Amino acid sequence: MSKTYHFIGIKGSGMSALALMLHQMGHNVQGSDVDKYYFTQRGLEQAGVTILPFSPNNISEDLEIIAGNAFRPDNNEELAYVIEKGYHFKRYHEFLGDFMRQFTSLGVAGAHGKTSTTGLLAHVLKNITDTSFLIGDGTGRGSANANYFVFEADEYERHFMPYHPEYSIITNIDFDHPDYFTGLEDVFNAFNDYAKQVQKGLFIYGEDSKLHEITSKAPIYYYGFEDSNDFIAKDITRTVNGSDFKVFYNQEEIGQFHVPAYGKHNILNATAVIANLYIMGIDMALVAEHLKTFSGVKRRFTEKIIDDTVIIDDFAHHPTEIIATLDAARQKYPSKEIVAIFQPHTFTRTIALLDDFAHALSQADSVYLAQIYGSAREVDNGEVKVEDLAAKIVKHSDLVTVENVSPLLNHDNAVYVFMGAGDIQLYERSFEELLANLTKNTQ
């Protein structure tokens, strides 16, 4: 009889992806979480995975229990019950570290761009050969016959340390998660420790001098735009249809590629994927063919059009990510006003990066701010308010609420870019409803 996996916190992006993957491999899967809607639960519901409210009644000794990394006995009754009874359980990252040993594994790490790059690598490889994958947008695919496993490696609290992949990409490093990391050097040390566990090939963005300090027992290949790299993206053309470029390895052209994505960061992400697959011996013609059909990942520059109004939803919640997202919007919509609607995520990050957020958001033409979304791990002690950020932004800025997003209507020929890692989608939904009601009233 097949074992049943129970996920404590199944709506988490990594947890939901892992649950879907195990479900597709034929295992019995269930999980528990809060009632509040989260975008990952749609895939779980479509797959028929049972989602329960948190309760000790969900727990029995015969379950294989996987606990989300954020949960502790003092904030989750199920985990408290598991520990009280002495039942065996694994944290998400511990389970994943053991699970991936049955495959040739390809990890994607980095402060920014992990999910998009993991999604692109998984998309290309699964269209060439049977591949399992786990992406941080809540998407997972499991196949018992797969030789390869593509996964996202998260640096927060050094969760990627149980992983020993054959290959890994490191897109960049940056100071983030100030509730855990003490500074950039601490972040670097975490990535350096992870890099030492990579077995066959490490692919690193080559235009960050700090990344050149990373060491690994695996061969290191640098990628980027400059000629000093091993893999170089050249002859770049950025249009409203995406980006075209050639990639050179050791000064020899290995292919011409098109990726239907926007922003310089997505050219770099694609170059990293190309480099990894080239070193693995994958046919570059096949790689080029399947790069063209990549449709993106959830909450990464996700677009919709409502009555000729363009709305973009993006997970960007760090200044570097905001700049990249706004750059992508300008590439695709060069003649439109770029309106940013941003919700800061966590008080600790907002305090630590306040000036950087102001600089990044000033790349938009107009800015609207939502109230700071606090993490369950922290308390609002009044040290920072969203008004503090608004005061530092040089462009026009204003505050909006879920109940009143009408100030957004004060723009013509605009693209609305909603960004954040909290519940910014509630603001987006309110704006969509407002647009729909306006359309009805004018018909």
Curated annotation (Swiss-Prot):
Span of the signal peptide: none
Binding site for ATP: G110, A111, H112, G113, K114, T115, S116
Cited InterPro entries: Mur-like_cat_sf, Mur_ligase_C, Mur_ligase_C_dom_sf, Mur_ligase_cen, Mur_ligase_N, MurCDEF_pg_biosynth, UDP-N-AcMur_Ala_ligase_MurC
Molecular function terms from GO: ATP binding; UDP-N-acetylmuramate-L-alanine ligase activity
Subcellular location: Cytoplasm
EC numbers: 6.3.2.8
Pathway: Cell wall biogenesis; peptidoglycan biosynthesis
GO biological process, alphabetically ordered: cell division; cell wall organization; peptidoglycan biosynthetic process; regulation of cell shape
Reaction it catalyzes: UDP-N-acetyl-alpha-D-muramate + L-alanine + ATP = UDP-N-acetyl-alpha-D-muramoyl-L-alanine + ADP + phosphate + H(+)
Record's GO cellular component terms: cytoplasm
Keyword field: ATP-binding, Cell cycle, Cell division, Cell shape, Cell wall biogenesis/degradation, Cytoplasm, Ligase, Nucleotide-binding, Peptidoglycan synthesis
Keyword Repeat applies: no
Pfam families, A to Z: Mur_ligase, Mur_ligase_C, Mur_ligase_M
Function: Cell wall formation.
HAMAP family in UniProt: MurC
Family according to the record: Belongs to the MurCDEF family.
Name of protein: UDP-N-acetylmuramate--L-alanine ligase
Species assigned in the record: Streptococcus agalactiae serotype III (strain NEM316)
Lineage: Bacteria, Bacillati, Bacillota, Bacilli, Lactobacillales
Annotated gene: murC
